[in-house]
Design a protein with these regions (language model features):
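Extracytoplasmic small-molecule ligand-binding "clamshell" domains
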Residues: 23-102
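Periplasmic-binding protein-like
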Residues: 41, 121-128, 194, 202-243, ...
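Bilobed "Venus flytrap"/periplasmic-binding protein-like clamshell domains
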Residues: 42-43, 54-70, 104, 125-177, ...
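Extended ligand-binding regions for polar small-molecule ligands
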Residues: 61-71, 132, 145-146, 153, ...
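Alpha-to-beta junction loops
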Residues: 73-75, 93-101, 145, 184-192, ...
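Acidic, polar ligand-binding/catalytic clefts
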Residues: 77-141, 216
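A ligand-binding cleft/hinge motif common to bilobed small-molecule-binding domains
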Residues: 86-87, 103-112, 158-161, 188-221
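Ligand-binding clefts/hinges and TM-proximal coupling segments of bilobed small-molecule sensing domains
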Residues: 154-170, 209-210, 241-270
Length: 270
């Protein structure tokens, strides 16, 4: 009898928690009863595996489904859409409830869109080529390299404030342009968040090398990634609560360990 009563109490608690999560999101999503999540076109490893977020494979895809579950949405109630990075950070109405594309939370962006609390704090890493393998992994050693980067990302302020290159860095439109500039010997190195740097070094550069990393707690302006939402979105409180619960339970750390485990093997820049 006691066991039956206890099981009933647990079931009631779980039902109450699920109902509360669903109540939080009720009437606040673009499509009632469904959560619309945007990602890039394409979406890249290790954030999304094989450009197929609906599989739940890859760090951001897995986090999206975990957050959705915490908010009371079944996997079949998660709808994926695509949106460009640059358009997403502009003010105005959105065709998604949340968007995950490694959006760094910055005061400037936060004036025109809303962000969730961070779901990942990213170390910044130096991407270069094997020809620069002997470059000292120190700020002083990196200063003399020819640097490039994507103008609209937070990597540029980190580069200028943490490394302060001897020459002005060259600016490009996106990650692909930076990689092509490196292949053409226009630049020697660029800063990316660590998982992206690892992917680019392994997949897009034949002789790519991640020389070192600045831990998130040491680099000025290091990236904290948040889910992006339309400014004033009432869903924000629900999303924040879900991420907080996943953080407290250790689930976020488990997802990070599963999909971003390579990040621990990169030397720290002194």
């Amino acid at each position: 009898m006691i066991r039956t009563a206890f099981a009933g109490a647990v079931a009631a608690t779980l039902l109450s928690t699920t109902a509360s999560a669903q109540d939080c999101a009720a009437g606040k999503t673009i499509e009632d009863g469904r959560l619309t999540v945007a990602t890039g076109n394409p979406a890249y490893f290790p954030w999304v595996i094989d450009d197929a977020p609906e599989t739940g494979e890859g760090f951001e895809a897995a986090v999206a489904y975990a957050v959705a579950e915490e908010m009371g949405f079944a996997p079949d109630d998660v709808v994926w859409t695509r949106a460009s990075f640059d358009e997403s950070i502009q003010p105005g109405a959105k065709n998604f409830d949340v968007n995950m594309q490694q959006f760094s939370i910055t005061p400037e962006r936060d004036q025109v869109v809303d962000f969730s609390v961070p779901y990942y704090r990213a170390a910044m890493a130096v991407l270069t080529r094997q020809g620069f393998a002997d470059t000292p992994a120190t700020v002083e050693g990196l200063r003399g390299l020819k640097w490039g980067g994507v103008a609209s990302t937070t990597a540029m302020p980190v580069l200028m404030e943490t490394i302060d290159p001897s020459d002005d860095p060259l600016l490009y439109g996106d990650n692909a342009d930076v990689v092509e500039a490196m292949k053409a010997n226009q630049i020697d190195a660029a800063l990316f968040d660590l998982p992206t740097a690892l992917y680019l070094s392994a997949v897009t550069l034949d002789d790519g090398l991640v020389l070192g990393q600045f831990p998130a707690d040491r680099a000025e302006g290091a990236d904290a990634f948040g889910m992006l939402m339309e400014e004033g979105n009432p869903l924000k409180a629900c999303v924040d609560a879900a991420i907080g619960a996943l953080d407290q339970s250790g689930r976020l750390a488990e997802i990070e360990a599963e999909w971003l485990s390579q990040a621990t093997d990169v030397p720290v820049i002194e």
